[in-house]
């Protein structure tokens, strides 16, 4: 099996390493639009810009030609889109224009499209309707609690591939399920993708609570009530609320809200310290998807009349309408309710 990964950021590089541990030499290709980045990887044996300290398998083929990266694949191979959510639309459009035969496609990004509040698979379906040449592709999402650095280092990890295609799930499992990585399968794309989007926003809230020294009780309340918000939204959109109790919901939420490697948690910590969002993002150096999708999640909840107070407050904090301290006061001042 050949595996092509589009995007040589931290997660793309990590998942390429995982695939290379299983596949034969030359079967795993890592594409980057930046030739200087690939030269640096070839020279040093690691992606110093995004995954420093992790030596990459020498069998990974480094690719700068987008067309070659796509056209090397057959209908039995796997294409992995490892761009951020902001790059998904453009990347999948390019893929569909070049595809000459059915492809197996998964994406790793988590979030919603700004302005439209579309889930990743809905973005893919939109682009498929515009650029498809009558070819039926199989597609899905790979998600779950995973820091790229730990995956790159080969540490234990469990993820979920979500797709309506059983064969795609089996291909993804064949590519990545080995050694210290387990891959579970699901047919609930909505639940898996929304869990990955909402948990990033909730991780910012947890970071704010920790940064304000509100205590472990407060953190537990944020995670528990945040999970309830996630489940309500998943059900309203048409997914399975029970999916939120798995790896891509509560599992990813726990990791992102409490792990020190979490960029979204770090945003919350620094907001609580009084730093401005532009300053935080400039120092971060990498994408924090919770910042980008908070407004989109809030818009989707309003459209569907789903109550998500923690998520809504995070949207107000990130847009500068509320300070972290005022957001806490508003949340704690809400009327008593039955727990649902």
Swiss-Prot record:
It catalyses: sn-glycerol 3-phosphate + NAD(+) = dihydroxyacetone phosphate + NADH + H(+); sn-glycerol 3-phosphate + NADP(+) = dihydroxyacetone phosphate + NADPH + H(+). InterPro entries: 6-PGluconate_DH-like_C_sf, 6PGD_dom2, G3P_DH_NAD-dep, G3P_DH_NAD-dep_C, G3P_DH_NAD-dep_N, NAD(P)-bd_dom_sf. GO terms for cellular component: cytosol. Its EC number is 1.1.1.94. Its main location: cytoplasm. NADPH binds at residues 11, 33, 110, 148, 263, 287, 289. Keywords: Cytoplasm, Lipid biosynthesis, Lipid metabolism, NAD, NADP, Nucleotide-binding, Oxidoreductase, Phospholipid biosynthesis, Phospholipid metabolism. Gene3D superfamilies: N-(1-d-carboxylethyl)-l-norvaline Dehydrogenase, domain 2 (1.10.1040.10), NAD(P)-binding Rossmann-like Domain (3.40.50.720). It holds the Pfam family NAD_Gly3P_dh_C. It comes from the Bacteria. The keyword Cytoplasm applies. GO terms for molecular function: glycerol-3-phosphate dehydrogenase [NAD(P)+] activity; NAD binding. The active site is at 199 (proton acceptor). Pathway: Membrane lipid metabolism; glycerophospholipid metabolism. One of its GO terms (biological process) is glycerol-3-phosphate biosynthetic process. SUPFAM superfamilies: 6-phosphogluconate dehydrogenase C-terminal domain-like, NAD(P)-binding Rossmann-fold domains. It is found in: Cytoplasm. The keyword Lipid biosynthesis applies. Catalyzes the reduction of the glycolytic intermediate dihydroxyacetone phosphate (DHAP) to sn-glycerol 3-phosphate (G3P), the key precursor for phospholipid synthesis. Belongs to the NAD-dependent glycerol-3-phosphate dehydrogenase family. NCBIfam families: PRK00094.1-2 (NF000940), PRK00094.1-4 (NF000942). This is Glycerol-3-phosphate dehydrogenase [NAD(P)+]. It comes from Polynucleobacter asymbioticus (strain DSM 18221 / CIP 109841 / QLW-P1DMWA-1) (Polynucleobacter necessarius subsp. asymbioticus). The gene is gpsA.
């Amino acid at each position: 099996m050949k595996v092509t990964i589009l995007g040589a950021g931290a997660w793309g590089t990590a998942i390429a390493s995982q695939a290379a541990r299983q596949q034969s030499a030359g079967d795993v290709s890592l594409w980057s639009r930046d030739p200087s980045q690939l030269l640096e990887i070839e020279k040093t044996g690691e992606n110093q810009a995004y995954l420093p300290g992790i030596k990459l398998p020498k069998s990974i083929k480094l690719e700068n030609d987008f067309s070659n990266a796509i056209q090397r694949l057959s209908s039995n191979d796997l294409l992995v889109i490892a761009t951020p959510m902001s790059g998904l639309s453009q990347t999948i459009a390019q893929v569909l224009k070049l595809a000459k035969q059915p492809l197996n496609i998964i994406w790793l990004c988590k979030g919603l499209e700004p302005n439209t509040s579309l889930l990743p698979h809905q973005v893919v379906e939109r682009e498929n309707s515009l650029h498809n040449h009558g070819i039926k592709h199989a597609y899905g999402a790979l998600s779950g609690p995973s820091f790229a650095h730990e995956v790159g280092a080969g540490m234990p990890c469990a993820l979920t591939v979500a797709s309506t295609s059983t064969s795609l799930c089996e291909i993804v499992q064949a590519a990545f399920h080995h050694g210290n990585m387990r891959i579970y399968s699901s047919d609930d794309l909505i639940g898996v993708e929304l869990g990955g989007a909402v948990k990033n926003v909730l991780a910012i809230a947890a970071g704010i609570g920790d940064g304000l020294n509100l205590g472990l009780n407060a953190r537990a309340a944020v995670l528990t009530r945040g999970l309830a918000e996630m489940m309500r939204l998943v059900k309203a959109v048409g997914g399975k609320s029970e999916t939120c109790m798995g790896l891509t919901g509560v599992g990813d939420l726990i990791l992102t809200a409490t792990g020190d490697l979490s960029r979204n948690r770090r945003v919350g910590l620094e907001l609580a310290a009084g730093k401005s969002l532009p300053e935080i993002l400039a120092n971060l150096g990498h994408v924090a998807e919770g910042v980008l999708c908070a407004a989109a999640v809030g818009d989707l909840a309003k459209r569907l009349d789903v109550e998500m107070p923690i998520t809504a407050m995070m949207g107000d904090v990130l847009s500068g309408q509320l300070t972290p301290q005022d957001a806490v006061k508003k949340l704690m001042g809400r009327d008593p309710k039955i727990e649902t």
